[in-house]
């Protein structure tokens, strides 16, 4: 996971020097709404013994991943993403990394299905594909995919 912002956002708001700077004007954050609470998820960054929870001024908040990413790329505010999602936008110059000496805990990914049903071949193939896909990106995020 990393914290990113569009170059247009940084040109307008300036480069924040510390994560807490994102909580004050002129900075904004693109908020992501948690599915279980409907509240904006906070971002917790770590550097050595220092831990900072960022709850900033939200330009927009959404529960849709595509809208979340589009808002960040459009320059509406800073956002946190898994590195594999940010990588193509970094390569195209649409996003720039912030606070590279800080870390954010990886975001868990779950596959949910009814436990009382037989696991069909399609579901098994999908689950195997997801595990392999995440293994490819695990070195980027520090996550270790596993299977039950």
Regions found by a protein language model. Give the residues of each.
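Residues that scaffold the ATP/ADP-binding catalytic core of kinase and kinase-like folds
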Residues: 12-13, 32, 89, 98
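Ligand-binding cleft/hinge of the Venus flytrap
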Residues: 19, 41-55, 89
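Secondary-structure junction motif
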Residues: 28-48
């Amino acid at each position: 996971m990393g914290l990113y912002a569009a170059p247009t956002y940084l040109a307008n708001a300036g480069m924040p020097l510390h994560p807490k700077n994102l909580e004050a004007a002129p900075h904004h954050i693109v908020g992501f709404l948690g599915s279980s609470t409907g509240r904006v998820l906070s971002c917790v960054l770590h550097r050595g013994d220092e831990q900072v929870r960022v709850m900033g001024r939200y330009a927009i908040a959404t529960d849709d991943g595509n809208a979340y990413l589009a808002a960040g790329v459009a320059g509406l505010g800073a956002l946190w993403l898994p590195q594999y999602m940010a990588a193509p936008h970094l390569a195209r110059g649409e996003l720039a990394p912030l606070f590279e000496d800080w870390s954010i805990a990886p975001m868990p990914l779950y596959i949910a299905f009814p436990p009382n049903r037989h696991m069909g071949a399609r579901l098994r193939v999908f689950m195997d594909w997801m595990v392999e896909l995440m293994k490819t990106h695990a070195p980027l995020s520090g996550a270790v995919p596993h299977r039950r």
